[in-house]
Each structure stands twice: as C-alpha cells, then as structure tokens.
C-alpha cells in the first residue's frame, strides 16, 4: 500500500483539552465513557457569559474526539447550576457586537451543539435542583434525584423566555402545559418531570451518579457502531424541533432585551427587565423555598423581587442557612469511589 500525500490532521487529546476547559469542567474518562462535570474553578458552576460560551465550545471539541464513545453530563455538588458570576456579564452587555455574539451564537450553540455535534449516546445525570438544565435535558436519557425542582425563570425578571428552556417545556410537557410553566415561571418537581416525559428515571439522591455509570457500562456491551446509530435515532425528534424553532426563540429573547435597552428600562431588580446579574441573586432562594411550586399570582411575582434580597441579608448576618452555599468544598464524582 502506498503512502498518502497527507496524513490525518492531529486533533487535541483529552489531556490537552482537559487543560483548556479546566475552569469550567472536570473531565474524567474510563473505558470510552467520558464524565463531564460542570463547575467554575473548584466550586459549582457560576452562570456567566464565559461559562455560556465554554459549554458550547467544549461540546464541539468532545465531538471531535472519537475516544469519547459515551458521555455523561453532570454538575459538581448536590445541585445543578444555582450560582451566577456577578461580574461575568460585562461583555454580554456591550453593544452591538459582543451582545450579538453572545445571544445570536452562544445562546444557540449551547443548545444545538448538544444534539447536532454529538453523535454518541449521552446521559444527563442531574444531582439536584437548579437552572439552565440544557445539557442534562438534551441528553438521550436524563435521570435525577427525588428532591429536584426546576423552572424557566425568565418571565419573573421581565425577559422573553427564549433561550431554549421554554421550547423544551413545550416539547416535553405538551404545548399548553409547557406554555403555562414557561409564561408563569412556576416550578415543577422530579415526579412531574417523570410523569410528563422530561426525565427517564427518578432515584434517591445518592444513587444518581452510580446509575448513570451503570447505564453507560450497559451500553458499552452493545457494538460501538450500533449504539452510535441508536443514539442518532434518539436525537432525531430534538433535531427536527431545533431546526424549526430554536433560532426563533433565541432571537426573540435578544429582540426583547434590545427593546428594553432602547427604552432605558433594563437594570436592577426594580427595572422592567432585570439585568442577568440581578436575576442571579434570586437563584439560591428559589431552590431553598418551595414558594414557586404554588400557582403564581401578581403578589408572588412582586415578592420575587424583594424576598430573596431580604433572605440573603439574613444569610449574611448568620440568621439563616443557605443550603446552596457555593463556598462549601465539593469534589467531582468518581465511579467506584476512585
């Protein structure tokens, strides 16, 4: 056999891109099964323009490494994402180019790369309550613990809920129920997610990660080619959904934000539309108290802008405990206690 004129392009190996993304994800691979644990530095992931972009970038890089045969997506600690970087949105606010790139490219890629770039089986392993659950719910199957509750929070803060979560609610819950939860910001529980088709299994909290690895190892017994083709069939309904509606949703959110900027009423918690860093102050409160699981009212919406701030003051004064405390030490899960 003769020698080809040019060889295959050398792409980065795991150890190299693991270093690239070390501030946003812990990557662990065993027997072709890759566990992606979202984080920021050594603690829980803090929502920011930078993490937004890093998620979509990492997913694209993972798709180029054929040694990643099955991928588990999870989050460090006992919750999904609950924190936000208060200084992580400065470039997001710069007009026109920076904001356009963040909202037109990053917001879309965050969703579509999970489905269109990854051709291998994926598992979303949710450790607990949180927001921006995109990568977990876009996985081929999703599992979560019994104490999980989630929501689409945008409407509370005056935003158009167009980053993809509302679209997935319509898809998984059905149009009317999805519209209701998207337009009211009411939270739903793990059992509701199971009943309505958003998750595949609900488990005791301490069994989620072990179960994710058990499923991945089960899939490994199936021929590589066949399980990969199987995964592409699993992704097809979401591919059709995203082709039809994703860009409309993301651009609608962007358009709504630009209108508020033009009107001069985007800003703090008293503005018509809250800036990202102000919305984020409410995150831990949302997953500490079950208020938002009740049918929302005008009064409860108004309280959303004041009660979390008062609660945080008590936490800072030592008069209340924050179960989502981002300063608690956490470590990524390892199978078999490694």
Each model region followed by its residue ranges:
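Acidic, divalent-metal-coordinating active-site segment for phosphoryl/phosphodiester hydrolysis
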Residues: 131-134, 185-192
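A short, well-ordered alpha-helical element
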Residues: 21-25, 47-71
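C-terminal alpha-helix plus adjacent terminal tail
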Residues: 1-31, 40, 66, 76-82, ...
């Amino acid at each position: 056999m003769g020698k080809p004129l040019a060889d295959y392009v050398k792409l980065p190996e795991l150890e190299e891109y693991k270093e690239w993304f070390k501030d946003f994800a812990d990557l662990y691979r065993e027997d072709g099964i890759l566990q992606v644990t979202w984080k920021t530095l050594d603690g829980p992931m803090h929502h920011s323009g930078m993490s937004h972009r890093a998620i979509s970038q990492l997913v694209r890089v993972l798709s180029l490494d054929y040694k990643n045969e099955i991928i588990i997506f999870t989050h460090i600690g006992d919750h999904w994402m609950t924190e936000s970087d208060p200084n992580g949105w400065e470039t997001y606010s710069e007009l026109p180019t920076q904001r356009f790139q963040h909202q037109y490219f990053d917001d879309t890629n965050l969703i579509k790369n999970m489905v269109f770039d990854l051709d291998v089986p994926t598992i979303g392993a949710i450790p607990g309550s949180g927001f921006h659950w995109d990568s977990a719910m876009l996985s081929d199957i999703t599992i979560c613990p019994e104490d999980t509750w989630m929501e689409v929070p945008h409407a509370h803060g005056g935003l158009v809920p167009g980053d993809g979560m509302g679209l997935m609610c319509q898809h998984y819950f059905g149009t009317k129920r999805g519209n209701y939860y998207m337009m009211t910001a009411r939270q739903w529980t793990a059992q509701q997610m199971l009943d309505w088709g958003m998750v595949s299994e609900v488990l005791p909290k301490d069994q989620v990660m072990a179960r994710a690895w058990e499923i991945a190892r089960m899939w490994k017994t199936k021929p590589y080619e066949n399980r990969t083709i199987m995964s592409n069939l699993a992704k097809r309904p979401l591919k059709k959904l995203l082709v039809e509606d994703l860009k409309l949703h993301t651009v609608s959110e962007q358009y709504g934000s630009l209108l508020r900027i033009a009107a001069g009423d985007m800003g703090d918690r008293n503005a018509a539309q809250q800036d990202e860093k102000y919305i984020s102050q409410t995150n831990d409160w949302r997953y500490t108290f079950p208020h938002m699981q009740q049918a929302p009212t005008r009064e409860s919406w108004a309280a959303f802008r004041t009660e979390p701030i008062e609660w945080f003051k008590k936490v800072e004064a030592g008069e209340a405990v924050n179960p989502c405390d981002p300063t608690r030490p956490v470590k990524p899960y390892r199978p078999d206690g490694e």
